[in-house]
Swiss-Prot record:
Protein name stated in the entry: UDP-N-acetylglucosamine 1-carboxyvinyltransferase
Classification via PANTHER family: UDP-N-ACETYLGLUCOSAMINE 1-CARBOXYVINYLTRANSFERASE
Upper taxonomic lineage: Bacteria, Pseudomonadati, Pseudomonadota, Gammaproteobacteria, Pseudomonadales
Described purpose of this protein according to its UniProt entry: Cell wall formation. Adds enolpyruvyl to UDP-N-acetylglucosamine.
GO CC, one annotated term: cytoplasm
Naturally occurring in which organism (per UniProt): Pseudomonas putida (Arthrobacter siderocapsulatus)
UniProt-annotated catalytic positions: 117 (proton donor)
Xref: HAMAP family: MurA
Amino acid sequence: MDKLIITGGACLDGEIRISGAKNAALPILAATLLADGPVTVGNLPHLHDITTMIELFGRMGIEPVIDEKLAVEIDPRTIKTLVAPYELVKTMRASILVLGPMVARFGEAEVALPGGCAIGSRPVDLHIRGLEAMGAKIEVQGGYIKAKAPEGGLRGAHFFFDTVSVTGTENIMMAAALAKGRSVLQNAAREPEVVDLANFINAMGGKVQGAGTDTIVIDGVERLHSANYRVMPDRIETGTYLVAAAVTGGRVKVKDTDPTILEAVLEKLKEAGADINTGEDWIELDMHGKRPKAVNLRTAPYPAFPTDMQAQFISLNAIAEGTGAVIETIFENRFMHVYEMHRMGAQIQVEGNTAIVTGVKALKVPGNGHLRASASLVLSALVAEGDTLIDRIYHIDRGYECIEEKLQMLGAKIRRVPG
């Protein structure tokens, strides 16, 4: 497995382009199964989970075609099997997203219970209950969810999510797109990635309204047609590079992004002392060589502060002036990176779902020079004195396209070495 070697101390300065959002691309790829003709999806990030989803289609008999711009064409009419096997699903929880589209379009599906990232418990109950509300018969046996649509297909339903679930909202919304009648999803997830999926369904001729609010209304249609669609930019990648510049006292301009989907993060960066300017598809951050100020934050579902940016802000607070409290309300076990930061001299006290971080002037390379991988630790290594070796970077590669190349473009001293 590859490793990253980072020499801290460089002040980042430059411009980079933001990749497509993995968390929008995966449900959009799943939704191509709803169409009755070929669909082309562009701006896909080159990440392991995207490759796994495309491989899953291959196992089902669909042969994805990739063009010179790395857009992928999927023709669901060539599907030969309605089974998503365990050996692929276990590596990626998002595989569950093919369940709703397959039941809606083909009348049945068999999807292995997912594995993937080990953050807390993420039950698939909401997906199952939502499909049952639409008339599907579902059994869970032998590690597989086996679903069958009723005679005449899925029926529109009113469904209330008792906890906000992004993938649950997406799965039921996709199924409802081809169901008979109207579906109303209440307490739905409001994330921009849900909106992007709704826009994609509508681009194929669907009738989805209210995405981005907590009530989504879907009027089922008889068929969804071919479309050409470009995936939205990745807001977490955007935020991570902005924080990278902030912790080093530097300047960065991120292009091909969308400032409107990152307002909670930009607000906290301003609190930390950053000067921020935005355009339609770019954000510029400048710290003017200053050390950031510590910030308090609480994660919550969109449009509040995203849980996927929490660790990066702990890295920021760790070298900031003052003390900041970070409260995690979404996932359990989301402070696993803190132990590694302690080894770098960070002053962090964890009490339940809260991390109290008191900034120090400088972080140091840990005793043996090694850290377990996470994007937040890459940020910490950028400001540590000396060379830090980050191993097990599989998890970074799952979420970030070409992280070392983009950081090099900003002046970071970072290189990838074979494991």
